[in-house]
Regions:
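Membrane-embedded glycan-lipid processing machinery
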Residues: 37, 89-93, 131-142, 353-357
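Hydrophobic/aromatic-rich transmembrane helices and adjacent perimembrane loops
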Residues: 135, 142-146, 349-373
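Transmembrane-helix signature of polytopic, lipid-linked glycan biosynthesis machinery
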Residues: 27-30, 129-136, 181-184, 231-236, ...
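Intrinsically disordered, polar/acidic, low-complexity terminal segments
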Residues: 3-76, 80-118, 164, 196-226, ...
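Membrane-interface alpha helices of multi-pass inner-membrane proteins
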Residues: 168-199
């Protein structure tokens, strides 16, 4: 009997480590079948800002360097020197980074001995193509890597919280926030830092209740280890010059005076986009196949999932054993608020459905699933209606994300076709006039998704041509 249990545990561990590999392989297949290796969108700005001399210290030692994500400088040097500034290389890094995040959850599932079915559901969310825009735009690779780092840091903290500390964990909890916030997190550091600060504050409170003075002092060190790099990032960010094309310029107060329900509608749509991809929801609404009110109801359903998970977490005192699910729930909820505060200036509630935010929003969904898994494993008493809601929520998330991924796979050839069009026209870009660019169908700024000046597009491709990079790179003989 014991041997059988050990074998079962062994196979479960293997699955928790191998399934993320399958997820990475799936993303690589998707990248291969939906993209081409051509500069576009934000890469045009990056080429004009940092190429051809990726070693130029003047491009690094700038007041707002932390907002530019320092790890990108190292990656850019490697990319230019070894791969000729390949966008595909960045996309692969993004897929691998998402795999690292999945492995972090695999470690948690192994440690907590949670069921494989729950892990499969978690992986379905993790590798869902509701993040297609981030996956295909390789410049976001560092964001995937940042979230893998967030999860790892939270797991180390959770280990200490649960009394399962390993050698070196204290040092990691002091150093990790500096490395993550100052090195790779960029604008995503705000919610991560707040979650870690709140977690450390919870540790201080618990230590004082238990009258453990040394433990309280240690958590205080953890708190300042997150606060100090956050303040440094905020200082660096104060020197950044931000452009918001399309912003109305109205203050939040003016917006609320005219449309007091706008924040609620925006956040409900951002929640709804975690069941079914935002692009699908927008298309349904535009075609009249779904009303805005149905979308809001879908958002309320997800909000109910948050509240039910939080209630279960507190009701069954899961915080005595693990803090990780609560960290995820808090981070997910705060991300919805943060996106509203940063995007209300456009006064378009459908902005909440952009796939570029799915990476942030899915944090909360993962927290909900983990909470349900922990309650289910512990065989805690839950009313039948509550269990039915848990089942309904998980089925909805699985089917919704599955449908979104299916639809995105169907769209992959059309996305690839658009990239191929960019690739074919790229050699012409350095020589086209503004009029010629605008006369094309679609116009060059629309095709390359860069609308900050045709001169910027022309100059970026001229730099690439002169230095034999990206589409102008000569094949190795």
């Amino acid at each position: 009997m014991m041997a059988e249990l050990k074998n079962k545990e062994h196979y479960r561990k293997i699955l928790c480590l191998l399934i993320p590999l399958g997820g990475v392989a799936f993303l690589l297949w998707y990248i291969k079948n939906s993209t081409c290796d051509v500069v576009y969108s934000d890469y045009i700005r990056l080429v004009n800002s940092y190429l051809p001399d990726v070693y130029d210290p003047r491009r690094f030692f700038v007041p707002d360097v932390l907002t530019r994500i320092p790890i990108n400088y190292l990656e850019r040097i490697i990319n230019v020197e070894l791969f000729g500034f390949s966008i595909t290389f960045d996309r692969v890094l993004g897929a691998v980074s998402l795999g690292l995040a999945a492995w972090a959850f695999g470690v948690y599932f192994i440690r907590r001995r949670l069921g494989t079915v729950w892990f499969l559901l978690t992986m379905a969310v993790m590798f869902s193509l509701n993040k297609w825009e981030m996956i295909t735009n390789g410049s976001g690779w560092s964001h995937f890597f940042a979230f893998a780092c967030f999860y790892y840091h939270e797991l180390v903290f959770d280990r200490v919280w649960a009394g399962e500390e390993k050698r070196g964990d204290t040092l990691q909890l002091i150093l990790l926030p500096f490395l993550i916030i100052l090195g790779t997190a960029g604008p995503y550091c705000a919610i991560y830092a707040v979650v870690m600060i709140l977690s450390a504050a919870a540790g201080i409170l618990r230590a004082r209740i238990r009258k453990e003075g040394s433990s309280a002092r240690r958590y205080l060190v953890f708190l300042f280890s997150s606060l100090i790099p956050l303040l440094l990032y905020i200082l660096s960010n104060s020197f950044a010059v931000e452009e918001h094309a399309g912003a109305t310029g109205r203050s939040l107060g003016a917006l609320l005076a005219d449309a007091p329900s706008f924040p609620v509608r925006f956040i409900l749509k951002s929640l709804a986009g975690m069941v079914i991809g935002g692009e699908e929801l927008i298309q349904w609404i535009e075609k009249g196949q779904m009303t805005d009110n149905i979308c809001y109801l879908l958002g309320l359903f997800v909000a109910a999932g948050y509240l039910w998970a939080l209630w279960l977490y507190l009701r069954h005192r899961l915080y005595e054993r693990t803090l990780f699910p609560l960290m995820l729930l808090t981070g997910g909820a705060l991300n919805h608020v943060l996106i509203f505060l940063s995007r209300y200036i456009f006064e378009k509630e459908n902005y909440a459905l952009s796939s570029r935010y799915a990476l942030q929003f899915q944090v909360g969904i993962l927290g909900i699933i983990l909470t349900f898994a922990l309650v289910s494993k512990a065989k805690e008493k839950v009313y039948p209606a509550g269990r039915a809601f848990m089942a309904l929520f998980c089925i909805a998330i699985l089917l919704g994300n599955g449908y979104t991924t299916y639809r995105e796979i169907k769209k992959a050839p059309y996305r690839e076709e658009r990239f191929e069009q960019m690739e074919q026209l790229a050699p012409l870009m350095p020589f086209l006039s503004d009029e010629e660019m605008m006369e094309m169908e679609p116009a060059v700024p629309d095709l390359y998704e860069y609308r900050k000046g045709t001169d910027q597009i022309r100059n970026a491709f001229r730099i690439l041509e002169e230095n034999g990079l990206n589409v102008f790179r000569k094949p190795a003989s």
